[in-house]
Amino acid sequence: MATITCTRFTEEYQLFEELGKGAFSVVRRCVKVLAGQEYAAKIINTKKLSARDHQKLEREARICRLLKHPNIVRLHDSISEEGHHYLIFDLVTGGELFEDIVAREYYSEADASHCIQQILEAVLHCHQMGVVHRDLKPENLLLASKLKGAAVKLADFGLAIEVEGEQQAWFGFAGTPGYLSPEVLRKDPYGKPVDLWACGVILYILLVGYPPFWDEDQHRLYQQIKAGAYDFPSPEWDTVTPEAKDLINKMLTINPSKRITAAEALKHPWISHRSTVASCMHRQETVDCLKKFNARRKLKGAILTTMLATRNFSGGKSGGNKKNDGVKESSESTNTTIEDEDTKVRKQEIIKVTEQLIEAISNGDFESYTKMCDPGMTAFEPEALGNLVEGLDFHRFYFENLWSRNSKPVHTTILNPHIHLMGDESACIAYIRITQYLDAGGIPRTAQSEETRVWHRRDGKWQIVHFHRSGAPSVLPH
């Protein structure tokens, strides 16, 4: 059967000069010939994409189609042709917000308030549409045009994810080092609050021209962030109003559940009553510091783009030392996006949830156990005498009549775990479980079982859909 190749982009659009270049894509000005309308085309070479990269590209296009807001760069079309994919966006000609600020003759706290208000409006729209950006930083804050008072536009949804309501889950280690939240660094479940943390970092920079967390050594930088170790040093912060500092404190709150939301931040007096609360004094020191900050960002960005351009899109076929191959390892990566969802990290995640499941079993915690199991879970285990068990009722019996009554210490060890990743949302783990316990007479015993568990991720949460346990029926392991 003949394959029909799409040529719609080639037929409808004419390409012009290059506007920007990433490691794996190029952005060029284009014109829709019949309408005479200008756009920016992000061109991705799909020949270099893995199946995983294709999924990410589809996710980005799907998310961008959802978002329609004056402070977000709009996606107008998404076209796939042989060897290339084209994302057709608004043509924004004003450049980066931070570059525009340093060219201004006058810049005050009130101007910073107006900037962060527009960023928060964009973030609020994202969150209302169930989208978390995950990569808010100066490079992704653009201006619609060169005209004075042009709108701030949020760009680059390459790392954005879809979430349900206020859902918190582990979506992978992703973002830009200096803007990462404590919960991401702790590898805790996360959600919309990560964007507000990044807004806090951006607002801090908007007011003084340098970031709240900074260290050339990435490990020390991450320690600072996890500890929330920032301050408002003299003399530059002495002229900043208490209300501005209060908003930063509310954004840079370590506990994500206590962190201010986008809707709440927009109601903060420093934003909602800008004309009477925010200072109008010109901040020359901020402009001078911001010039240095911009120069440092550009230099480091250029170095990393050059490094990354030599790698495959997935970074998996470079042939280099894998340990040093990721951007994550580089101290030069403070302003460069990373997405550390490589095989090693994902396998560690499966081991972690398996350990949590076994801990729930050892503690006789049926409630936690059920949260980690699909309601229709199937199982082969010795206690079922060769029968396939479906659902949780069979397992409930052991929790109610054995585990809940066992007050003696139990120690479990997982040996030789082998994990098979089956796409983004499924994984299989096989291992030997050694269980040490005290029998009825108080004598230490050891039991062994060979187990295979199949995990499936739904709405960001891993659940067991099937398991198989070998060995003789035993008193404790389940």
Curated annotation (Swiss-Prot):
<dbReference type="GO" id="GO:0005954">
    <property type="term" value="C:calcium- and calmodulin-dependent protein kinase complex"/>
</dbReference>
<keyword id="KW-0067">ATP-binding</keyword>
<dbReference type="GO" id="GO:0048813">
    <property type="term" value="P:dendrite morphogenesis"/>
</dbReference>
<dbReference type="GO" id="GO:0051928">
    <property type="term" value="P:positive regulation of calcium ion transport"/>
</dbReference>
<dbReference type="GO" id="GO:0000082">
    <property type="term" value="P:G1/S transition of mitotic cell cycle"/>
</dbReference>
<dbReference type="GO" id="GO:2000124">
    <property type="term" value="P:regulation of endocannabinoid signaling pathway"/>
</dbReference>
<dbReference type="InterPro" id="IPR011009">
    <property type="entry name" value="Kinase-like_dom_sf"/>
</dbReference>
<keyword id="KW-0460">Magnesium</keyword>
<feature type="binding site">
    <location>
        <begin position="19"/>
        <end position="27"/>
    </location>
    <ligand>
        <name>ATP</name>
    </ligand>
</feature>
<keyword id="KW-0808">Transferase</keyword>
<dbReference type="GO" id="GO:0060996">
    <property type="term" value="P:dendritic spine development"/>
</dbReference>
<dbReference type="GO" id="GO:1902108">
    <property type="term" value="P:regulation of mitochondrial membrane permeability involved in apoptotic process"/>
</dbReference>
<feature type="active site" description="Proton acceptor">
    <location>
        <position position="135"/>
    </location>
</feature>
<dbReference type="GO" id="GO:0010666">
    <property type="term" value="P:positive regulation of cardiac muscle cell apoptotic process"/>
</dbReference>
<dbReference type="GO" id="GO:0005524">
    <property type="term" value="F:ATP binding"/>
</dbReference>
<dbReference type="GO" id="GO:0046872">
    <property type="term" value="F:metal ion binding"/>
</dbReference>
<feature type="binding site">
    <location>
        <position position="42"/>
    </location>
    <ligand>
        <name>ATP</name>
    </ligand>
</feature>
<feature type="modified residue" description="Phosphothreonine">
    <location>
        <position position="337"/>
    </location>
</feature>
<keyword id="KW-0547">Nucleotide-binding</keyword>
<dbReference type="GO" id="GO:0051346">
    <property type="term" value="P:negative regulation of hydrolase activity"/>
</dbReference>
<dbReference type="GO" id="GO:0046427">
    <property type="term" value="P:positive regulation of receptor signaling pathway via JAK-STAT"/>
</dbReference>
<dbReference type="GO" id="GO:0046928">
    <property type="term" value="P:regulation of neurotransmitter secretion"/>
</dbReference>
<keyword id="KW-0597">Phosphoprotein</keyword>
<dbReference type="InterPro" id="IPR017441">
    <property type="entry name" value="Protein_kinase_ATP_BS"/>
</dbReference>
<feature type="region of interest" description="Calmodulin-binding">
    <location>
        <begin position="290"/>
        <end position="300"/>
    </location>
</feature>
<keyword id="KW-0418">Kinase</keyword>
<feature type="modified residue" description="Phosphothreonine">
    <location>
        <position position="336"/>
    </location>
</feature>
<dbReference type="GO" id="GO:0048168">
    <property type="term" value="P:regulation of neuronal synaptic plasticity"/>
</dbReference>
<feature type="modified residue" description="Phosphoserine">
    <location>
        <position position="330"/>
    </location>
</feature>
<dbReference type="GO" id="GO:0035254">
    <property type="term" value="F:glutamate receptor binding"/>
</dbReference>
<dbReference type="GO" id="GO:0004683">
    <property type="term" value="F:calcium/calmodulin-dependent protein kinase activity"/>
</dbReference>
<dbReference type="GO" id="GO:0005739">
    <property type="term" value="C:mitochondrion"/>
</dbReference>
<keyword id="KW-0449">Lipoprotein</keyword>
<keyword id="KW-0112">Calmodulin-binding</keyword>
<dbReference type="Pfam" id="PF08332">
    <property type="entry name" value="CaMKII_AD"/>
</dbReference>
<dbReference type="InterPro" id="IPR000719">
    <property type="entry name" value="Prot_kinase_dom"/>
</dbReference>
<dbReference type="GO" id="GO:0099148">
    <property type="term" value="P:regulation of synaptic vesicle docking"/>
</dbReference>
<keyword id="KW-0966">Cell projection</keyword>
<dbReference type="GO" id="GO:0045202">
    <property type="term" value="C:synapse"/>
</dbReference>
<dbReference type="GO" id="GO:0002931">
    <property type="term" value="P:response to ischemia"/>
</dbReference>
<keyword id="KW-0963">Cytoplasm</keyword>
<dbReference type="InterPro" id="IPR013543">
    <property type="entry name" value="Ca/CaM-dep_prot_kinase-assoc"/>
</dbReference>
